[in-house]
Amino acid sequence: MTNSQTVSLIGPTQMAPQSTPPPPVNELWFIDAQAMFQNYANLRSFSKSNANEINTTIGGFVFGRKARKQVIHVLFAYAEDLTESNRQFLESSLSADIELVGNLNIDGQSQILPGGQFTLQLTSRMLENRSISEFLDMNVMFNNEHVLMEGASCVSRVGYEWSLRAGREQEDVKSAAERLSMASFRFTYLNAEHGLVIREQKPEAAQQKYLDKFSKGAVPYKDVIEFTAMQSLTRDTSNDTEDQKLVPTVKVTKDNKHFTRLVTIGEVVFPAFFGDSSLDLYKRSREAFNRRANNTMMVTVNGIRAGRGVTTTTSATYLPPGWVSLLHLQLPTKWTDNEQRNYRIRLHKLFNLPSSKPVLRLSQALALHSESARLTNKKLIREPHLSITNYQPVGEITTVNGPYNYHHYMQDGIDDSGWGCAYRSFQTIWSWFILNGYTDKPVPSHREIQQALVDIQDKQAKFVGSRQWIGSTEISFVLNELLKLECRFIATNSGAEVVERVRELARHFETSGTPVMIGGNMLAHTILGVDFNDTTGETKFLVLDPHYTGSEDIKTITSKGWCAWKPASFWSKDHFYNMVLPQPPSDAI
């Protein structure tokens, strides 16, 4: 998708505007009105750069859990995007327990799609003012309540192969997805460690609740049950009377057609809630598999229609900010950087995600399956400050916003003890930009950092491969050269002045959220947060120390002060300090 304004992902199939009366009050549903208002604001934030959209009619889709009477997502869309094909794409990307439950009527205009049980009555003024009371007055069948995130994630990797004829790829992709859906009953999911099996059950076994001990109190982004997918060659036919069941048919043609073989490894993820029966889990596993296949089909067809040919995809699972369920996408892997950026912009609009920061970079995907974790985990400790216990705040705490990796002396087989602390602080900062979706470029090595400084003529050629120190200025130069990032500076004449600038640091963590490199007294450290009492002036700094030379032992790192809250006296009163505050771009998606 080369244009973020493309109307639909598959086809137009647009619904005509209708005016719908309020639904009868016969059941009580739950909705998080603030989350709905935020989604509306996110979509409208895209229109600020497009004058043609400012007055365009807006409608939307309401997705939820019918059995629990919960609205999970209210996704707003401009009129041209209110299509059945987009509804199918959105649903195929959501958790397998979530489906279309309603439609929207905004200022008397609505686009009704089949499957909705009710229509939310909204006004532009209500949405812009975030008026919960007005919403509840107009929608008496709803309670405003934050829906809790719950359930374990069942995850498995399933491979499937499609053969696509030259000139008929779209037709063959759709047919292949339909065949996969029809054959999904053949899949059995096995966890040998715990003796768990998810499969089609006989009636007497269908109500067993054998995952309750795993799903009680679980949350889907960290409590994972991994399954191996196995395909049955036959269905259980013990109660059938026919002699012949499913018979495979092979049709051979000799027309010299060129075929493209498309192999996809899809990550199938579905939730297990406390109280689910084995039948619930089996149905959900089939639905999750079908959604992966359909999502793959839609992205592939879209690529063909856009003239990119048959594209390979990879599975990615996300927990976007403010969401209480997971988002599952098949993302193209061979598109250009610009094509992928335009596609991400498109997805941000469809899912009402922020327009000002990345959410759907591959580096931001959850590593739920062990194979995904193996490919993404370099055995670095992530966010060690979250493992600090028994700290008593002295005032108001503000910290780094988003994940980062702890880089320190002696990693990567490099003995940089005594000279590499600023390089390691730089690498920690760079990891933040990777893990928060601002870049896909790997963390630079010491040599690559040195080469960048030579390239901008800050250092001579002999600097590359040396053991010379770098400081705060060099760090800002390299961030600008390699990532085109701007940095703010705080310069102080003593450690006492570092404390005086604590309000600036707090504001930085609140607005920008990046780690801060501080250099002085021939040492470099990384500041991850501040704790400031505005009444007493007492201040503490959350410091990550790159001088650590040990193994990746989180207990040692947090208990021995390598990642810890430090008093103001930690900064020497006899030395000056310079701080580098990297600024994330405001238009990166």
UniProtKB/Swiss-Prot annotation:
UniProt KW Kinase keyword: no
Protein's name according to its UniProt entry: Ufm1-specific protease
Top-level EC class: hydrolase
Gene that this polypeptide is encoded by: odr-8
Species the sequence originates in: Caenorhabditis elegans
Active-site residues, record numbering mapped to chain: 421, 545, 547
Principal location: endoplasmic reticulum
One Gene Ontology CC term in the entry: nucleus
Lineage, top ranks: Eukaryota, Metazoa, Ecdysozoa, Nematoda, Chromadorea
Record GO biological process: chemotaxis; positive regulation of chemotaxis; protein localization to non-motile cilium; proteolysis; response to ethanol
Membrane topology qualifier: Peripheral membrane protein
Sequence segments annotated as region (Disordered): 1-22
SUPFAM superfamilies membership: Cysteine proteinases
Compartment(s) where it occurs, according to its Swiss-Prot or TrEMBL record: Endoplasmic reticulum membrane; Cytoplasm; Cytoplasm, Perinuclear region
Gene Ontology terms for molecular function: deUFMylase activity
Entry keyword set: Chemotaxis, Cytoplasm, Endoplasmic reticulum, Hydrolase, Membrane, Protease, Thiol protease, Ubl conjugation pathway
Job of this protein: Thiol protease which recognizes and hydrolyzes the peptide bond at the C-terminal Gly of ufm-1, a ubiquitin-like modifier protein bound to a number of target proteins. Required, with oct-4, for the localization of a subset of 7 transmembrane domain odorant receptors, including odr-10, to the cilia of olfactory neurons AWA and AWC. Operates in aggregation behavior, and responses to oxygen levels.
Phenotype when the gene is knocked out: Aberrant localization of odr-10, str-2, str-112 and str-113. Reduced response to odorants mediated by AWA and AWC olfactory neurons. Increased aggregation and response to O2 levels when knocked down with npr-1.
Tissue specificity comment: Expressed in head and tail neurons. Expressed in the amphid head neurons ADL, ASI, ASH, ASJ, ASG, ADF, ASK, AWA, AWB, AWC, and in two tail neurons, the phasmid tail neurons PHA and PHB.
Record EC number: 3.4.22.-
Keyword Cytoplasm among UniProt keywords: yes
PANTHER family: UFM1-SPECIFIC PROTEASE 2
Similarity annotation: Belongs to the peptidase C78 family.
Subunit structure and binding partners: Interacts with odr-4.
